[in-house]
Amino acid sequence: MDKYDDLGLEASKFIEDLNMYEASKDGLFRVDKGAGNNPEFEETRRVFATKMAKIHLQQQQQQQLLQEETLPRASRGPINGGARLGPPAHREAGGGSKLAADGAAKPPLAASTVAPGTTITVAPGQPSYPPQEQRAKLYVRGSRQGSQDCGSKESMVNSEMSAFHRPGPCEDPSCLTHGDYYDNLSLAGPKWADDPGVSPGIRLGVGSGWSGTPGSDPLLSKPSRDPHLYHQQLSAGSGRSLQSGQDGGPGGGNSEKPAGVWTTASSQRVSPGLPSAGPENGALPRSAQPRTPSFSAPLALNRPSQGSLPRTNSGVGSEVSGTMPKPTVDPQPWFQDGPKSYLSSSAPSSSPASMDHMQAGALPGLGPKPGSTDPGIGPKLSPNSLVHPVMSTLPELSCKEGASSWASDGSLGPVLPETPSSPRVRLPCQTLIPGPELGPTAAELKLEALTQRLEREMDAHPKADYFGACVKCSKGVFGAGQACQAMGNLYHDACFTCAACSRKLRGKAFYFVNGKVFCEEDFLYSGFQQSADRCFLCGHLIMDMILQALGKSYHPGCFRCVICNECLDGVPFTVDSENKIYCVRDYHKVLAPKCAACGLPILPPEGSDETIRVVSMDRDYHVECYHCEDCGLELNDEDGHRCYPLEDHLFCHSCHVKRLEKGPSPAALRQHHF
């Protein structure tokens, strides 16, 4: 599954194989619990879990309908490859129908899926399941003859189904992932030879009788016929051992181990005709010592069995009698190791079936052991049965008792009641339990804490007194009493302090040097004065306000008019070509042009800085001084008002002609019209 490490690929694979999976507690596919939980992923998993619950319910309904269709045909033929049995009568030796296991071991698919209709049983205290590559399914075909002996001498496959019940990380089937859920339904093999106290499972063979001698192996254990069969179930972390005892025969050695069959809550279907586990899987381990008796029965199981199964002493097989077909099969070959499956459901076990063990005569292909016959007596229930407590953790998974029995002897399909009007079979249901909700992440907790702190600060101060955030501590500035503005920035009164002495600088002179703020004393005596500006006029350090003009720095007291000596801080000023500073009034008085007519300086009008003057013959005139000297006509550029100078005098055209008629001087004749 390396290629499905990526959650996206694994989700895509799950969608493709949707019908191969069942919903589980962990969700739809594997989730890395160590990784941080993604809220989007959790929401997606919940949505898929809801959909899978609906799909699972539909599948359960379809299986229930299929079971209802199968029940009426139970008396006409075998169900799911089961044997068709004759009328309920005790058979003589060699006259019963024999259950034959044909085919060889075949490794299961990668998904290890078991067809619906097969009941998988596990026993407490038995070995773990085999590896997946060695698993095989055993399908048993029964004889179609109801009252005659098949006479089949074919070699039978000895099989056994048992599993140790050891605590695992999660014993609830809803806790298993989809792949593990089916893998854990794999086949198991006991370790008899190593541990004589291990409860043997169910074994099936031909050519074996009942033996009371040591070294014999118990064979298939059959439950007594009872129309009220119940589904044995167990919960996670606890188990109830369903065990039955068998009184010894004349040989006194027919003691059996606790059967301890646990029936899973999942119904599987198996198809007849598939190969079963063969002897190529290895020789069957045999016990060298007789089994010590051990009796246990489920709670409230006190009534005697209503029917007993006779045993055969001819060595040709085990005989099964009953009015309804009851196909029996052990779907697990014998292996030593493998994964364990811990499956649980909610209803307590109340099956009155008695389990007894017959011993296998020989491996497939071998004849029956001589002298291993023993008259069979029907199984009985021990009143002094040991009851193991069971705790149900999933009460919602319980099904109605008495409706059907999930075979505790490893048989295929549900055990059908022997009455013609059998009740409906209700399949066990399994609900999807969503995973626990994960708490908020560290980033969410930090964001929530910051938000709450900001809300507390906003609630502690009126919103009208909020000025903004301090550039030094980034906290809000509330109230004018602690607000300080300097260099265009907002500070707390306690944040705007001298970098050297930490004194508050609100309302005091400060010096900003290299990104730090200093008070005047620290600035003067800490060596920073070397970087201070010097006045352009006096040449001294500027320790107070700095006035910059024309690219130079001045003390405010040094920046004065050279004429009136008035301080020009905040007052319009001008300079001449010699860099002398003048106020505007003195500048015009000193540097303003003089009128050629009246000889006075031409100054700007009151309230204005602009000077209006008339320039004629390279001379400057006031506007009111530029007129005809004879008639006083205002001269300008209009027609009839043009100036006609004569001998450096200003005249209009008529006055100019008159001056010429009187005999102008030769100098006046050379005048040109302007």
Curated annotation (Swiss-Prot):
Region of interest (Disordered), residue spans: 73-109, 142-165, 204-388
Sorted UniProt keywords: Cell junction, Cytoplasm, LIM domain, Metal-binding, Nucleus, Phosphoprotein, Repeat, Repressor, RNA-mediated gene silencing, Transcription, Transcription regulation, Tumor suppressor, Zinc
Region of interest (Necessary for nuclear localization), residue spans: 470-674
Pfam families membership: LIM (PF00412)
Skewed-composition ranges (Polar residues): 144-161, 232-244, 303-316
Domain of life: Eukaryota
PANTHER family recorded: LIM DOMAIN-CONTAINING PROTEIN 1, LIM DOMAIN-CONTAINING PROTEIN JUB
Subunit structure: Interacts with SQSTM1 and RB1. Interacts with EIF4E, AGO1, AGO2, DCP2, DDX6, LATS1, LATS2, EGLN1/PHD2, EGLN2/PHD1 and EGLN3/PHD3. Interacts (via LIM zinc-binding 2) with VHL. Found in a complex composed of LIMD1, VHL, EGLN1/PHD2, ELOB and CUL2. Found in a complex with TRAF6, PRKCZ and SQSTM1. Interacts (via LIM domains) with TRAF6. Interacts (via LIM domains) with SNAI1 (via SNAG domain), SNAI2/SLUG (via SNAG domain) and SCRT1 (via SNAG domain).
Protein family membership: Belongs to the zyxin/ajuba family.
Protein name stated in the entry: LIM domain-containing protein 1
Name of the gene this protein is made from: LIMD1
